[in-house]
UniProtKB/Swiss-Prot annotation:
Taxonomic placement: Bacteria, Bacillati, Bacillota, Clostridia, Eubacteriales
A Pfam family it matches: MTTB
Segments traversing the membrane: none
Keywords on record: Methyltransferase, Transferase
Name of this chain's protein: Proline betaine:corrinoid methyltransferase
Superkingdom of origin: Bacteria
Example GO BP: methylation
Gene3D superfamilies: Trimethylamine methyltransferase-like (3.20.20.480)
Induction field: Up-regulated during growth on proline betaine.
Amino acid sequence: MYVNRRFYDKYVSTRDVELLHEYSLRVLKEVGVSFDCEEALEIFKKHGATVEGSIVKIDEDLLNQALETAPKTFTITTSAGETKIGERYKPKTVGCYGPPKFLFEDDEYRVAKKDDMVKFLKLMDTSDVTDFVNNSAYDTPDLDKTKEDFYLPQVAMCLKYSQKPTYGNVANSMNVRGKSLKQEAKDIAKLYKEFYDIWDRPVLLTNTCALSPLGYSYEVLDNIMGLVEEGQPVTIITCSMTNLTAPAALLGSVIQNNATILAGIVLTQLINPGNPVIYGTVSTATDMRNVACSIGAPEAQLIQMASLALGRYYQLPVRTGIAGTDSLKPDYQAGVESFMILMTTYLGKSDFVLNHAGILQAYALGSYEKFVLDEEVNRILLRLNRGIDISDVKAEKVFDAIKKAGPLGNYLSGRTPKEYRQEHWLTKLFNRQAGNPQPIFDEIGDLRERASKEVEERVAGYTLPDLTKTQKDILNRYLPEDEKF
């Protein structure tokens, strides 16, 4: 079981959470949330919500009914096994998500292409701190966009390159034509069920983002309804910006986000009671000097910690935290900001994190080097969360060791003790060598150089999953021509 440090308790009290909940209820009942979808509006009407045009107002009773059916934990099942998500389990992770451009090893910014996305899939597949895979870039310029549906070919790439479960994105009206997005979402779910030959359980998890302030677009709603009808879990998130799409006060951002997320969760439970859903937010600050989304701001951590406390109050699985930075390069700023925001995931203890590695410039850039550097940050935070192993038995043992060494003695004798190996994290990329700095630097090089070398070694050592003929035949119906088996 993962130790839950509940770091959010240092930010918000139980009374604070109750106040946030109280005003969220008022927003739901008195202000409402916009749903740009007739089918969703009819579902709310049928279950007694107040519907005024596209605005849905939800009372406390309807909210509580939905929260009663939403599960505390759930499991994603694939042919490789089970991935459990919930408060008692280690946070689950997935990498760089959807930036249009990458920072490449030659220090140039370029539009990502399909092979660049595949390289990220290989890094995610070979990562010991990455649980899911996803498309790190979408709708790349080298895809065949004459097809009515060039989204499913991208989805199929995740199944080709990894046996880890997939964290999906919503289809949109740009990459799917000729059918509804709801049908596309159902088709994606059916592809995964057929590929795994698992028909009665969740087989993938999908990210769905509200439209702040207090709204859901028809595209997102179509995807939510299609996936939930197929029994597949969704993450409902907000990504609001203070003083732009959320109030200037952090308190207002948390209240508005909470009301928005809860409204989406209610819809999932009205469609399919008991369907797994994750309560999530990556809402953040706005730098009003240039009206920019600032995902590495300390206010982002504060907003997400408070939202994490609310998710725990509702006893729902929670998604918060990112290796988020506004930096343009994997530099000092990137490390500081990524560590700070990822604290929400590992020490606040949320249950899922998207963009746990590899993102730059407020989601606009991906970086292979930052991915492997962020892996080290994830490992450090995992180690910090374990804490110190303190027990009567261990105390007696270390006292004997202290007594044996005595004053001015030492502990360096024989083989490295088991306790050292168990309790110390040893970095793969960061420098810990001591001595004359110049020869050390000449030997190991700059940190980015070491990261780049790690990337190339990982990609070179990658091997495709061993798929069955049936699985290959299924994927060949969808994969881009140059990716078929």
